[in-house]
């Protein structure tokens, strides 16, 4: 299976570095200019929870969306804007284009990728699937359009458990890709028969149970929130496990005033916004400074800046294109996910 080279990771950090922080005047200029361009071009900005707070705030201010990847896909699909600007990583832009082939999809940069996407080349993954033709292929949203086209289902961390549980109840066996930690978590929770691809998120894989136990000893009254892309030993220490949106909901509902959070620190913007009376602490990674690869923030998410956002709008640059031959195959598993989650929402509303 493909391994992500340290060179790629180091380069991502270098690319993500900001030349210098913006002054208050510069920030105000970019925010105003971007808002004007969005309005003039009938465009909407959607941003992931892991983007820098300034990008998330701008999406909210301009009538866009800040959410997890499932809601980003749903919002972009339902919004009437002719142009969707996706602040996130490349697979999110591709997903928006697959679901809305008639729309123009722009990104602040096309260099913002994902270690899960990079670690699951379509030729290798397809060969793996071909060895087990009897199995249903379920892939995480953090994959290329080509890998999605090879799948039967696409899932996000907010709906993966329910979808796999449903497939298991139907007697289906599963190939899962690419995140091995999320796959292991789902396998343990559902008891499903799953073959796992060997991929990992560079942010979540760095959280370590020993350091987390030490931190819990320092904050004994704190609750621990963990994203399921983390290693099993970290998940086992959690008071709540879930997707970004589920962790935000847990932060609101748990009585604890201090929360240790094992996911990308970009999520703190929304948590602090919704829970201003609570204290949020980053879970420790394997190292600090130069010793850690991600240091609890995705280097590719950090590439989404105000400067790049304005530039892509003014120039029409960094447009996402997906091979038209792939779209019919890739949209099928995505629509299955959206239909499944919509049906689950309606059922929940009916039971309320």
Swiss-Prot record:
GO terms for molecular function: 4 iron, 4 sulfur cluster binding; metal ion binding; quinolinate synthetase A activity. One of its GO terms (cellular component) is cytosol. The keyword tRNA-binding does not apply. SUPFAM superfamilies: NadA-like (SSF142754). Pathway: Cofactor biosynthesis; NAD(+) biosynthesis; quinolinate from iminoaspartate: step 1/1. [4Fe-4S] cluster binds at residues 114, 201, 298. Its main location: cytoplasm. Its cofactor is [4Fe-4S] cluster. Binds 1 [4Fe-4S] cluster per subunit. Pfam families: NadA. One of its GO terms (biological process) is 'de novo' NAD biosynthetic process from L-aspartate. Keywords: 4Fe-4S, Cytoplasm, Iron, Iron-sulfur, Metal-binding, Pyridine nucleotide biosynthesis, Transferase. Coiled coil: none annotated. PANTHER family: QUINOLINATE SYNTHASE, CHLOROPLASTIC (PTHR30573:SF0), QUINOLINATE SYNTHETASE A (PTHR30573). Catalyzes the condensation of iminoaspartate with dihydroxyacetone phosphate to form quinolinate. Belongs to the quinolinate synthase family. Type 1 subfamily. This is Quinolinate synthase. It comes from Pseudomonas fluorescens (strain Pf0-1). The lineage of its organism: Bacteria, Pseudomonadati, Pseudomonadota, Gammaproteobacteria, Pseudomonadales.
């Amino acid at each position: 299976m493909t391994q992500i080279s340290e060179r790629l990771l180091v380069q991502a950090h270098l690319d993500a570095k900001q030349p210098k922080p913006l002054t208050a005047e510069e920030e105000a200029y970019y925010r105003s200019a971007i808002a004007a361009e969005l309005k003039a071009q009938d465009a909407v900005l959607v941003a992931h929870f892991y983007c820098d707070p300034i990008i998330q705030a701008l999406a909210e201010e301009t009538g866009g969306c800040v959410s997890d990847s499932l809601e980003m896909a749903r919002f972009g699909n339902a919004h009437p804007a002719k142009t969707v600007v996706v602040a996130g990583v490349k697979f999110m832009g591709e997903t928006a284009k697959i679901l809305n082939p008639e729309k123009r999809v722009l990104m602040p940069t096309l260099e913002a990728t994902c270690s899960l996407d990079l670690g699951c080349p379509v030729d290798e993954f397809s060969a793996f699937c071909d060895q087990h033709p009897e199995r249903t292929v379920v892939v995480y949203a953090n994959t290329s359009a080509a890998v999605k086209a090879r799948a039967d289902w696409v899932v996000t961390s907010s709906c993966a458990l329910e979808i796999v549980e449903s497939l298991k109840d139907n007697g289906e066996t599963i190939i899962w890709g690419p995140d091995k930690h999320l796959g292991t978590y789902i396998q343990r929770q559902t008891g499903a028969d799953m073959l796992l691809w060997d991929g990992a998120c560079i942010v979540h894989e760095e959280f370590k149970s020993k350091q987390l136990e030490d931190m819990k000893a320092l904050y004994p009254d704190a609750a621990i929130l963990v994203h399921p892309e983390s290693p099993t030993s970290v998940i086992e220490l959690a008071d709540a496990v879930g997707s970004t949106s589920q962790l935000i909901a847990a932060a609101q509902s748990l009585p604890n005033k201090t929360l240790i959070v094992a996911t990308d620190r970009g999520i703190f913007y929304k948590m602090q916004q919704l829970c201003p009376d609570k204290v949020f602490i980053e879970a420790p990674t394997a190292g600090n400074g130069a010793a850690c690869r991600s240091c609890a923030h995705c280097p590719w998410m950090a590439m989404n800046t105000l400067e790049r956002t304005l530039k892509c709008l003014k120039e029409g640059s960094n447009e996402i294109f997906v091979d038209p031959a792939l779209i019919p195959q890739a949209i099928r598993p995505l629509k299955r996910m959206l239909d499944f989650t919509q049906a689950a929402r309606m059922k929940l509303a009916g039971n309320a």
